[in-house]
Amino acid sequence: MEPVYFLPMKSPFLSRIDTGAETSSVDADHVVSFERDGEKWVAFNLVNRETGEKHRFEKKIKRQPTVKRINGSEERVVVMMDVRMGEEIVKAEFSLAARDRFNYQGLIGRNILTGRFVVDTSLANALR
């Protein structure tokens, strides 16, 4: 678990580090797709469960992969997000997911970890 700041938000989202996940994801709600200048965009809210801080984002859709699940498959929306982990600011792909049933609102995958961070499973909050 590590604190991750979804910029420009001021409070961190506790996020699970998952070296098995290719793409990072974040708990988003009120997700609405729309078109702007002939391109696909999405508007969504991020709400920090710990602090109640809320921010409405509008992002261009980077891709929409189909994710296979046990009970079928679902299409996910992937956008580029600016995040801060420790002292490092990273622009990376995040899939927008309903993570309300999970303990952590964010999941940090290999797309952020590779070449930037070393994972030590014996530690938590190592970036603080």
Task: Place the predicted regions along the sequence by residue.
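Pepsin/retropepsin-fold aspartyl endopeptidases
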Residues: 1-128
